[in-house]
Amino acid sequence: MRRAKITIVGAGNVGATCAHWCAAAELGDVVLLDIPRTEDMPRGKALDLMQASPIMGFDSNIVGTTDYADTADSDVIVVTAGLPRKPGMSRDDLLATNAKIVTSVAEEIKATSPNAVIIVVSNPLDAMVQQMFKVTGFEPAKVIGQAGVLDTARYRTFLAMELGVSVEDISALLMGGHGDTMVPVPSCTSVGGIPVTQLISKERLDEIVDRTRKGGAEIVSLLKTGSAYYAPAAACAQMVEAIVKDKKRVIPVAAYCDSEYGVGGYYVGVPVVLGSGGVERIIELSLTDEETKAFQNSVDAVKSLVSTMDGLLAE
């Protein structure tokens, strides 16, 4: 049986860690790509990972390269390329530079792997995945953004820490943009099947939501020289697994919404069924009035971000 071919674009912390997770889980063979000026760096990381395989007991081929020809006919491509956040920066501060990087990557993917499912990780996420979709011209189901899995994982972690319970017993959902306007859905949040609102006061829940919104910035401020990578890479690997194994996972991703939720042609975080074809369907929830208002506010922020990006690229 043919192994899946998984390409990671960007061999920095997120990309290399994602390659590690994917290889260790034997999700397929991995190509780790970076720009030519990095010279042999991706090859070095790939070789290091390969040498871990006999110790950790996984059997995946891992190749490092600076040539998109080596990525040809990939099944899944994870795009982590772009400048990372530094202390004091918002995700939006990266907009102009990373939009140009993502445009270049999109053109290469279109030429070499026209049938791939693309997972965009580069920030600001909601604008970058929109740009990837625009430049590749791929069907919208095959271009998705990694945001909701990570945001929900952070939310679940903080809830578990607050309650002193296992993270495995926390079920939660966050929607909307990847940033300060992300929307918690309390009606879809439970602890061992118990509604979270029965266990935590609204005031304390609001504080946990606020920490979740600032979760990436908190890590940036602690690291000082970089941004989060273990959890973002793990989130990517979970999405890759859902695709290559056709698992039909119900998870939140940045998906192209047209009529869904009345969004009107933008990428925004919503729950989907994720399988071999990418987004197989978007799940539309009945939100409360408060949740609906917060979600629309988040969508408006995404639209404004995309409009700003389009203006910068047109200059």
Swiss-Prot record:
GO terms for biological process: carboxylic acid metabolic process; tricarboxylic acid cycle. Substrate binds at R85, R91, N123, R154. It comes from the Bacteria. SUPFAM superfamilies: LDH C-terminal domain-like, NAD(P)-binding Rossmann-fold domains. InterPro entries: L-lactate/malate_DH, Lactate/malate_DH_C, Lactate/malate_DH_N, Lactate_DH/Glyco_Ohase_4_C, Malate_DH_type3, NAD(P)-bd_dom_sf. Catalyzes the reversible oxidation of malate to oxaloacetate. Belongs to the LDH/MDH superfamily. MDH type 3 family. This is Malate dehydrogenase. It comes from Rhodopirellula baltica (strain DSM 10527 / NCIMB 13988 / SH1). The gene is mdh.
